[in-house]
Amino acid sequence: MNFLSRIISPVVIFIISIQFIFAIPEAFVYNHSTEQAFYFFESVTIDGQVVDADDWVGVFNGDVCVGARRWGECYGTSCDVPVMGYDNSEYTTGYMMPGGMPSFKIFDASESEYLDAVASEDIPWFNGSYEILDNLQNAVSGCTDADACNYDDTAN
């Protein structure tokens, strides 16, 4: 093997392996659109703990993924998550329409688990908007009626 081959082979292997380290979770694959909005989250938590850099936030319109971002791409600060809208192309069928309400999921990479998530505010989607939200947290089911006998103060 010549000198150049000894250098190029490890570099190619490294580049290919990097693609798999940060591969987007299967359920979070989406197409880009000319119609876009961004939802910025100050924090994202699972059971009250800040998510890891390898965890992902996904945005959905029904069961169609319309955007996603790996938390580590934001370097521990507020994170922008792109949310794509329908732009009259076949690639964006089922994407957000003006006034539609997106839903969110968190992919916990350490557990390989998708979790339903609840944003601190419900903000409808509009093309070109930039929304800032305090928090996104995994959904904790339970009774949210403070006067009920089975009230769960951790439920959302």
Region locations from a protein language model:
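Primarily marks secretory-pathway-exposed extracellular/lumenal segments that are disulfide-
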Residues: N2-N156
